[in-house]
Amino acid sequence: GIPCAESCVWIPCTVTALLGCSCSNNVCYN
């Protein structure tokens, strides 16, 4: 997928999750 410029190591994807991004390998991907 496309990296969403947000990490999810300590907390889940927040703002980017609203854009359809999900956590994968500690990074939010679209």
UniProtKB/Swiss-Prot annotation:
It comes from Viola hederacea (Australian violet). Keywords: Cytolysis, Disulfide bond, Hemolysis, Knottin, Plant defense. The keyword Disulfide bond applies. SUPFAM superfamilies: Cyclotides. This is a cyclic peptide. Probably participates in a plant defense mechanism. Has potent hemolytic activity. The presence of a 'disulfide through disulfide knot' structurally defines this protein as a knottin. This is Cycloviolacin-H4. GO terms for biological process: defense response; killing of cells of another organism. There is a cross-link at residues 1-30 (Cyclopeptide (Gly-Asn)). The keyword Disulfide bond applies. Disulfide bonds join 4-21, 8-23, 13-28. Belongs to the cyclotide family. Bracelet subfamily. InterPro entries: Cyclotide, Cyclotide_bracelet_CS, Cyclotide_sf.
